[in-house]
Amino acid sequence: MSSKRAKTKTTKKRPQRATSNVFAMFDQSQIQEFKEAFNMIDQNRDGFIDKEDLHDMLASLGKNPTDEYLDAMMNEAPGPINFTMFLTMFGEKLNGTDPEDVIRNAFACFDEEATGTIQEDYLRELLTTMGDRFTDEEVDELYREAPIDKKGNFNYIEFTRILKHGAKDKDD
């Protein structure tokens, strides 16, 4: 009977341990990048991201988040946000994104010459006037790290790769 109890306890603990499986979703360099991001957000260095940490981090980026916005962000986590929870949340978000070919094909609809690029002014117009409209500030933020050549061509193939795999392979 005690062996049955042990199995029952193990089964009950499984959901808590399942978060550690998130480490298998990312390679070592990605985990290191997430750790660096976590440490930048964890302003008070207590090993947890709290509402004040989020506020300070966003303020350092020139944002002035409301309490409601911060509460909504904090409520996305089922409990305290330590590094494992942070990684789990990112894993869930990344798994929730569309497959790479779906994203690339969405951009390709606006690339009539099949060059793999879209003129940045045309893409800005599309993003600010169609569907879930972006603000000019949101487009500016997107373009800040986007692969745009000197002629103003947004490379959506490279952008999609960065979106799904990160910028780490850029030098490879």
Curated annotation (Swiss-Prot):
Residues 29-64, 98-133, 134-169 form the EF-hand domain. It comes from the Eukaryota. Ca(2+) binds at residues 42, 44, 46, 53. GO terms for biological process: actomyosin structure organization. One of its GO terms (molecular function) is calcium ion binding. Keywords: Acetylation, Calcium, Cytoplasm, Cytoskeleton, Metal-binding, Motor protein, Muscle protein, Myosin, Phosphoprotein, Repeat. SUPFAM superfamilies: EF-hand (SSF47473). Phosphorylation increases the actin-activated myosin ATPase activity and thereby regulates the contractile activity. It is required to generate the driving force in the migration of the cells but not necessary for localization of myosin-2 at the leading edge. Phosphorylation is required for myotube formation. Phosphorylated by DAPK3; DAPK3-mediated phosphorylation is inhibited by LUZP1. The modification N-acetylserine is found at residue 2. Gene3D superfamilies: EF-hand. Myosin regulatory subunit that plays an important role in regulation of both smooth muscle and nonmuscle cell contractile activity via its phosphorylation. Implicated in cytokinesis, receptor capping, and cell locomotion. In myoblasts, may regulate PIEZO1-dependent cortical actomyosin assembly involved in myotube formation. This is Myosin regulatory light polypeptide 9.
